[in-house]
Amino acid sequence: MKYSAPIRLNALSAIVSHHGVLVVIGMLLAVPMAFPLFPIAATYCAAILAILLPLGRLQHVLATASSIAFAWLLTLRNPSRGLVEAGLGDDALHYMNAFYEFQQNYCCSPLDVLKTGIRSAGGGEPIFWYLSYGVAKLFDTPLMVWAILIFISLMLVWIAIYRSTERFAYVVFVAYLSTITLYALQGSAIRQAVAVGLVMVALDLLIRRRLVWAACVGLLAAGTHSSAAALLLVCATVMLFLSKDYGMLARKASWLGQLGRLLVLLVLAVAAVAFGSAEFVMSKIQARLSENQTGSAWEFQLAVEAVLACLFAWLFRMKLPREEKLTYFLFVLLCASTSFFAPAVGARLFRYTYCFYIVYLCVFFFAREGESLGQKKTLASLLFLASLGWAFYIVDVRYQGLFVSGGVIDHFLAGPFF
């Protein structure tokens, strides 16, 4: 796989040293929240100019600025309405309660921090709660803890994209932000939002064959939200048994490698038999749709987008390593199976399908041969406009509108947390 010039691992230091002023610009864009159309319009204008301008440092600067501004604006999106009013559910208030207890020094020891997290939100992943505890000690209100955690998750995703391709990173970033997943992750699924960012970084390291670092970051992701462990398990299975590049397990002469391939084929055969009946599949789909649950609808939306991403990759003959394609296929199969037989698990796993096809989109702009720069800019512009329309539709239909009048704090629910 061909990538642009690699970015150093200390990406945050590079951003601050070379583009420190852009962070300030992104912060300033979020100030006039009483007039939310202005900062959002300015951010989109910067991204459009970055697409249309010729190559050069100015284009890179605008791309970086628009990406950071998008992250910060979406950080403040949820606080612009009441948490429950915006369709985010009661879990958001449970997280706020945990942040409030952290700030009031109700818990001090590591064990107390975990107990507070489990009691408030029902999840005992230590990495997330220790991170939340550290952030809570730096700010006065649960609102700021919430916003900083969202910003951290967005910047982790952005860093992974920035390291993969520097020229069109903003296009892929906008495409990622335009889907329903990030809106959901910023609501009741704040733990998984941070985990998604860590998984993206782990996948980037895995692509670069930095296996030790990828494993370390992957463990951090699993410690942030347990559903990330399923993705790591699928990746490990593909790397150990199906990849041509990793150790003795991949050699045809290795009996363990052959056993691994046989095991994978057996699993696929069982899955094919289980899903071989059209009546069975249709009955499961109808049962899921008739449950009248808010999660089932967007779960199938993610499944459709995952299939479209696969078609997109094969249609344009994406130059991805074989193990990456197999990993994505096995993971989508796992998600489809769990969505039928274990809906509570499947709804969480499907969010990680974005990690794969964001990588597909990153590679897309550098893998296509025989195209002029103008053609690539045209494709980028079309993708950008499509993602903008999709974002407006999703937010307006499912989250009662993005553009609201008044300040950020004024729209929050009254209560002890604010």
Swiss-Prot record:
<keyword id="KW-0997">Cell inner membrane</keyword>
<feature type="transmembrane region" description="Helical">
    <location>
        <begin position="347"/>
        <end position="367"/>
    </location>
</feature>
<keyword id="KW-0625">Polysaccharide transport</keyword>
<comment type="similarity">
    <text>To S.marcescens SfuB.</text>
</comment>
<keyword id="KW-0813">Transport</keyword>
<feature type="transmembrane region" description="Helical">
    <location>
        <begin position="377"/>
        <end position="397"/>
    </location>
</feature>
<keyword id="KW-1003">Cell membrane</keyword>
<keyword id="KW-0812">Transmembrane</keyword>
<keyword id="KW-0843">Virulence</keyword>
<protein>
    <recommendedName>
        <fullName>EPS I polysaccharide export inner membrane protein EpsF</fullName>
    </recommendedName>
</protein>
<keyword id="KW-0472">Membrane</keyword>
<keyword id="KW-1133">Transmembrane helix</keyword>
<dbReference type="InterPro" id="IPR049458">
    <property type="entry name" value="EpsG-like"/>
</dbReference>
<keyword id="KW-0762">Sugar transport</keyword>
<dbReference type="GO" id="GO:0005886">
    <property type="term" value="C:plasma membrane"/>
</dbReference>
<dbReference type="Pfam" id="PF14897">
    <property type="entry name" value="EpsG"/>
</dbReference>
<feature type="transmembrane region" description="Helical">
    <location>
        <begin position="326"/>
        <end position="346"/>
    </location>
</feature>
<feature type="transmembrane region" description="Helical">
    <location>
        <begin position="262"/>
        <end position="282"/>
    </location>
</feature>
<feature type="transmembrane region" description="Helical">
    <location>
        <begin position="170"/>
        <end position="190"/>
    </location>
</feature>
<feature type="transmembrane region" description="Helical">
    <location>
        <begin position="296"/>
        <end position="316"/>
    </location>
</feature>
<feature type="transmembrane region" description="Helical">
    <location>
        <begin position="21"/>
        <end position="41"/>
    </location>
</feature>
<dbReference type="GO" id="GO:0015774">
    <property type="term" value="P:polysaccharide transport"/>
</dbReference>
<feature type="transmembrane region" description="Helical">
    <location>
        <begin position="222"/>
        <end position="242"/>
    </location>
</feature>
<feature type="transmembrane region" description="Helical">
    <location>
        <begin position="142"/>
        <end position="162"/>
    </location>
</feature>
<comment type="function">
    <text>Probably involved in polymerization and/or export of exopolysaccharide EPS I which functions as a virulence factor. May play a role in export of EPS I or its intermediates across the membranes.</text>
</comment>
<feature type="transmembrane region" description="Helical">
    <location>
        <begin position="45"/>
        <end position="65"/>
    </location>
</feature>
